[in-house]
Protein backbone atom coordinates (compact mmCIF):
# COMPACT_ATOMS: atom_id res chain seq x y z
CA UNK A 1 0.00 0.00 0.00
CA UNK A 2 1.48 3.38 -1.00
CA UNK A 3 1.17 6.61 1.04
CA UNK A 4 -1.86 7.84 -0.90
CA UNK A 5 -3.72 4.54 -0.41
CA UNK A 6 -2.81 4.56 3.29
CA UNK A 7 -4.22 8.07 3.77
CA UNK A 8 -7.43 7.00 2.05
CA UNK A 9 -7.74 3.92 4.25
CA UNK A 10 -7.06 6.04 7.33
CA UNK A 11 -9.82 8.48 6.35
CA UNK A 12 -12.31 5.65 5.83
CA UNK A 13 -11.32 4.07 9.16
CA UNK A 14 -11.84 7.39 10.95
CA UNK A 15 -15.19 7.95 9.28
CA UNK A 16 -16.36 4.52 10.43
CA UNK A 17 -15.29 5.15 14.04
CA UNK A 18 -15.95 8.89 14.43
CA UNK A 19 -18.23 10.23 17.14
CA UNK A 20 -20.56 13.22 17.05
CA UNK A 21 -20.11 13.94 20.76
CA UNK A 22 -18.88 17.42 21.71
CA UNK A 23 -15.05 17.39 22.04
CA UNK A 24 -14.91 20.93 23.50
CA UNK A 25 -14.77 21.53 27.27
CA UNK A 26 -15.80 24.94 28.65
CA UNK A 27 -13.93 26.01 31.78
CA UNK A 28 -15.41 29.52 32.14
CA UNK A 29 -17.38 32.12 30.21
CA UNK A 30 -17.66 35.90 30.21
CA UNK A 31 -20.29 38.17 28.69
CA UNK A 32 -18.45 40.68 26.48
CA UNK A 33 -21.21 42.64 24.75
CA UNK A 34 -24.99 42.76 24.58
CA UNK A 35 -27.58 44.73 22.62
CA UNK A 36 -31.20 44.04 21.56
CA UNK A 37 -30.04 41.92 18.58
CA UNK A 38 -26.83 40.11 19.51
CA UNK A 39 -24.83 38.90 22.50
CA UNK A 40 -21.09 38.17 22.45
CA UNK A 41 -19.62 35.66 24.92
CA UNK A 42 -15.98 34.70 25.38
CA UNK A 43 -15.35 31.13 26.54
CA UNK A 44 -12.22 29.70 28.11
CA UNK A 45 -12.04 26.20 26.64
CA UNK A 46 -10.10 22.99 26.36
CA UNK A 47 -10.06 22.39 22.63
CA UNK A 48 -10.40 18.99 20.89
CA UNK A 49 -6.63 18.47 20.99
CA UNK A 50 -6.65 18.90 24.78
CA UNK A 51 -5.04 22.35 24.84
CA UNK A 52 -6.44 25.47 26.56
CA UNK A 53 -7.74 28.32 24.43
CA UNK A 54 -10.52 30.87 23.94
CA UNK A 55 -13.61 30.87 21.76
CA UNK A 56 -15.83 33.85 21.05
CA UNK A 57 -19.47 33.23 20.12
CA UNK A 58 -22.00 35.67 18.70
CA UNK A 59 -25.53 34.73 19.77
CA UNK A 60 -28.33 36.09 17.58
CA UNK A 61 -31.52 36.88 19.46
CA UNK A 62 -33.66 36.66 16.33
CA UNK A 63 -33.99 33.93 13.75
CA UNK A 64 -32.90 34.85 10.21
CA UNK A 65 -35.85 34.77 7.83
CA UNK A 66 -35.60 34.81 4.04
CA UNK A 67 -38.33 34.79 1.39
CA UNK A 68 -37.88 34.09 -2.31
CA UNK A 69 -41.01 35.32 -4.12
CA UNK A 70 -41.75 33.67 -7.46
CA UNK A 71 -44.67 34.63 -9.68
CA UNK A 72 -46.50 32.56 -12.29
CA UNK A 73 -44.15 33.76 -15.06
CA UNK A 74 -41.11 32.75 -12.97
CA UNK A 75 -40.13 36.31 -12.10
CA UNK A 76 -38.65 37.00 -8.71
CA UNK A 77 -37.99 40.13 -6.64
CA UNK A 78 -34.67 41.30 -5.23
CA UNK A 79 -34.10 44.00 -2.65
CA UNK A 80 -31.06 46.26 -2.95
CA UNK A 81 -29.59 47.97 0.08
CA UNK A 82 -26.25 49.15 1.47
CA UNK A 83 -24.99 46.69 4.09
CA UNK A 84 -23.22 48.51 6.90
CA UNK A 85 -21.00 45.60 8.10
CA UNK A 86 -19.74 44.94 4.55
CA UNK A 87 -19.46 48.61 3.54
CA UNK A 88 -20.93 47.69 0.18
CA UNK A 89 -24.20 47.44 -1.71
CA UNK A 90 -25.99 44.10 -1.77
CA UNK A 91 -28.80 42.54 -3.82
CA UNK A 92 -30.82 40.04 -1.78
CA UNK A 93 -34.18 38.38 -1.49
CA UNK A 94 -36.47 39.90 1.18
CA UNK A 95 -34.92 39.09 4.55
CA UNK A 96 -35.15 40.03 8.19
CA UNK A 97 -35.19 38.90 11.78
CA UNK A 98 -37.90 36.71 13.25
CA UNK A 99 -38.36 36.95 17.03
CA UNK A 100 -37.91 33.71 18.95
CA UNK A 101 -41.22 32.23 20.08
CA UNK A 102 -43.13 33.56 17.06
CA UNK A 103 -44.04 31.32 14.12
CA UNK A 104 -41.27 32.01 11.56
CA UNK A 105 -43.84 31.88 8.76
CA UNK A 106 -45.57 34.93 10.27
CA UNK A 107 -42.23 36.72 10.31
CA UNK A 108 -41.68 35.74 6.68
CA UNK A 109 -45.07 37.17 5.68
CA UNK A 110 -44.26 40.40 7.50
CA UNK A 111 -40.85 40.75 5.86
CA UNK A 112 -42.20 40.11 2.36
CA UNK A 113 -44.90 42.76 2.79
CA UNK A 114 -42.60 45.30 4.42
CA UNK A 115 -39.84 45.10 1.83
CA UNK A 116 -41.74 44.46 -1.42
CA UNK A 117 -45.43 45.09 -0.75
CA UNK A 118 -46.18 41.51 -1.79
CA UNK A 119 -48.53 39.02 -0.18
CA UNK A 120 -48.44 35.34 -1.09
CA UNK A 121 -51.19 32.71 -0.96
CA UNK A 122 -48.78 29.74 -1.13
CA UNK A 123 -45.82 29.28 1.21
CA UNK A 124 -43.24 26.48 1.21
CA UNK A 125 -40.28 26.10 3.54
CA UNK A 126 -37.39 25.14 1.27
CA UNK A 127 -34.26 25.37 3.42
CA UNK A 128 -32.88 25.71 6.93
CA UNK A 129 -29.36 27.07 7.22
CA UNK A 130 -26.60 28.02 9.69
CA UNK A 131 -25.17 31.28 8.39
CA UNK A 132 -21.71 31.47 9.96
CA UNK A 133 -21.27 28.47 12.23
CA UNK A 134 -17.62 29.07 13.15
CA UNK A 135 -18.41 32.25 15.10
CA UNK A 136 -22.19 32.44 15.57
CA UNK A 137 -25.28 30.37 16.27
CA UNK A 138 -27.40 32.30 13.75
CA UNK A 139 -30.09 30.03 12.33
CA UNK A 140 -32.07 30.79 9.22
CA UNK A 141 -35.25 29.55 7.56
CA UNK A 142 -35.95 30.19 3.87
CA UNK A 143 -39.40 30.17 2.29
CA UNK A 144 -40.62 30.10 -1.30
CA UNK A 145 -43.63 32.41 -1.76
CA UNK A 146 -46.01 31.82 -4.69
CA UNK A 147 -49.38 33.18 -5.90
CA UNK A 148 -48.38 36.79 -5.34
CA UNK A 149 -50.52 39.91 -5.00
CA UNK A 150 -49.02 43.41 -5.02
CA UNK A 151 -49.69 45.93 -2.24
CA UNK A 152 -47.67 48.90 -0.96
CA UNK A 153 -44.28 48.21 0.68
CA UNK A 154 -43.91 49.13 4.37
CA UNK A 155 -40.13 49.44 4.94
CA UNK A 156 -38.64 50.12 8.38
CA UNK A 157 -37.13 53.56 8.98
CA UNK A 158 -33.61 52.06 8.96
CA UNK A 159 -34.08 50.63 5.47
CA UNK A 160 -33.37 52.45 2.21
CA UNK A 161 -34.42 49.84 -0.31
CA UNK A 162 -34.61 49.44 -4.06
CA UNK A 163 -36.96 46.69 -5.28
CA UNK A 164 -36.14 44.96 -8.57
CA UNK A 165 -38.45 42.54 -10.37
CA UNK A 166 -36.55 40.29 -12.75
CA UNK A 167 -36.73 36.85 -14.37
CA UNK A 168 -35.62 34.11 -11.98
CA UNK A 169 -33.13 32.96 -14.63
CA UNK A 170 -31.42 36.36 -14.39
CA UNK A 171 -31.24 36.10 -10.59
CA UNK A 172 -29.67 32.67 -11.01
CA UNK A 173 -27.06 34.17 -13.36
CA UNK A 174 -26.35 36.88 -10.76
CA UNK A 175 -25.55 34.14 -8.25
CA UNK A 176 -23.35 32.27 -10.71
CA UNK A 177 -21.33 35.35 -11.68
CA UNK A 178 -20.91 36.63 -8.12
CA UNK A 179 -23.25 39.63 -8.26
CA UNK A 180 -25.27 38.12 -5.41
CA UNK A 181 -23.17 37.13 -2.39
CA UNK A 182 -25.69 37.08 0.46
CA UNK A 183 -25.58 33.50 1.75
CA UNK A 184 -29.32 33.03 2.31
CA UNK A 185 -30.15 34.41 -1.13
CA UNK A 186 -27.53 32.22 -2.80
CA UNK A 187 -28.90 29.15 -1.00
CA UNK A 188 -32.50 30.01 -1.89
CA UNK A 189 -31.84 30.66 -5.58
CA UNK A 190 -29.74 27.52 -6.00
CA UNK A 191 -32.40 25.43 -4.22
CA UNK A 192 -35.20 26.82 -6.40
CA UNK A 193 -33.11 26.31 -9.54
CA UNK A 194 -32.73 22.66 -8.48
CA UNK A 195 -36.48 22.35 -7.93
CA UNK A 196 -37.14 23.86 -11.35
CA UNK A 197 -34.66 21.53 -13.08
CA UNK A 198 -36.27 18.52 -11.38
CA UNK A 199 -39.83 19.69 -12.27
CA UNK A 200 -40.77 19.92 -8.61
CA UNK A 201 -42.35 23.38 -8.72
Where are these regions (language model features)?
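Positively charged N-terminal leader segments that act as targeting/secretion signals
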Residues: 1-12
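Nudix hydrolase/Nudix homology domain
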Residues: 13-24, 89, 100, 125, ...
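Conserved Nudix-box catalytic region and its N-terminal flanking loop in Nudix hydrolases
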Residues: 21-23, 58, 66-110, 157
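Acidic, metal-coordinating catalytic segment for phosphate/diphosphate chemistry
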Residues: 29-66, 72
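Short, solvent-exposed loop/turn elements at beta->coil junctions and helix N-caps
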Residues: 29-32, 127-132
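Active-site-adjacent beta-strand/loop module that shapes the phosphate/pyrophosphate-binding cleft
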Residues: 41-49, 132-151
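Short aromatic/basic micro-patch
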Residues: 92, 142, 165
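A short coil-to-beta-strand element that immediately follows conserved catalytic motifs
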Residues: 119-126
Amino acid sequence: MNASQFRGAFTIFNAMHHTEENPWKITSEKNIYDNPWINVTEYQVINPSGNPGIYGKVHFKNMAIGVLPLDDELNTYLVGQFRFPLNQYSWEMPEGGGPQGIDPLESAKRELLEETGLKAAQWTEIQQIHLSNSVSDEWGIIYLARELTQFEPEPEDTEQLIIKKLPFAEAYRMVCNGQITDSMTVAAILKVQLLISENQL
